[in-house]
Curated annotation (Swiss-Prot):
It comes from Schizosaccharomyces pombe (strain 972 / ATCC 24843) (Fission yeast). PANTHER family: PROTEASOME SUBUNIT ALPHA/BETA. Signal peptide: none annotated. GO terms for biological process: proteasome-mediated ubiquitin-dependent protein catabolic process. It comes from the Eukaryota. InterPro entries: Ntn_hydrolases_N, Proteasome_alpha, Proteasome_alpha-type, Proteasome_asu_N, Proteasome_sua/b, Proteasome_subunit_alpha6. Its main location: cytoplasm. GO terms for cellular component: cytosol; nucleus; proteasome core complex, alpha-subunit complex. This is Probable proteasome subunit alpha type-1. Keywords: Cytoplasm, Nucleus, Proteasome. Belongs to the peptidase T1A family.
């Protein structure tokens, strides 16, 4: 840590090894939250899934949220600091609303991802600012490119995926998804897409979930983004159990 001394106090200065320590700390911050999320695209749909942990029995579970709508057709899952997550979601909604007001049509998912990544990158080079300790995974079904899935990180990097994960178990989850996609290809419908995501989390975390321990957002062709109810999640869990 002696090598980091002096260079981890500001995000605008590279260390002699070419590292930005505050940006690296931001990556650790969203992993330290202990929540793993996953995003999966299907042939005409996409979904995002997050663990849902309620640390205290007195907390109202309905107020613990990791999945958020951005616009009618775009949603996201936020992994990491929930305070930073709400700030980034609020900014994304503002950017999308301003884009639609100026251009007369909804902001495409890839354009929103690029805009939010550019905003995040600015936080890595200016003084008196810090990177957000959160990873943002956006989903939509675009009129031109179809199902879209983009992940943004605290460094301002973004890229599109067929399926991806964020959080402490993202490596294990992504490895499972790679094997699944290589074997079975892209899920053919919404049910398969959602259950693929759930099974990926189950495998990487080595646990069976209750319906109250997951939060799932889905978007389909010509249908708005929505968050599944506890009953709908339970139906998917029952379907997975019957297959096993």
């Amino acid at each position: 840590m002696s090598q980091a001394r002096g260079f981890d106090r500001t995000i605008t200065v590279f260390s002699p090894e070419g590292r930005l320590y505050q940006v690296e700390y931001a990556f650790k911050a969203f992993n330290n939250a202990g929540i793993t999320s996953v995003g999966v695209t299907g042939k005409n749909c996409a979904c995002v899934i997050s663990q849902k942990k309620v640390p205290d029995k007195l907390i109202d579970a309905s107020t613990v949220k990791h999945v958020f709508p951005i616009t009618k057709g775009i949603g996201c899952v936020m992994t990491g600091s929930i305070a930073d997550a709400r700030a980034q979601v609020s900014r994304a909604r503002s950017e999308a609303a301003e884009f639609e007001y100026k251009n007369g049509y909804p902001m495409p998912c890839d354009v929103l991802a690029k805009r939010m990544a550019n905003i995040a990158q600015v936080s890595t080079q200016r003084a008196a600012m810090r990177p957000l300790g959160v990873a943002m995974t956006l989903v939509a079904v675009d009129d031109e490119i179809g199902p879209s899935l983009f992940k943004l990180d605290p460094a301002g990097f973004y890229i599109g995926y067929k399926a991806t994960s964020a959080g402490p178990k993202q490596t294990e989850t992504i490895n499972w998804l790679e094997k699944r996609f290589k074997k079975d290809g892209i899920p053919s419908n919404l049910t398969d897409t959602v259950e693929t995501g759930i099974q990926a989390l189950m495998s990487s975390l080595s646990t069976d979930f209750k319906s109250t321990e997951l939060q799932i957002g889905v978007v389909e062709d010509d249908k708005p983004f929505r968050v599944l109810s506890v009953e709908e999640i339970e139906a998917h869990l029952q379907s997975i159990a019957e297959k096993d």
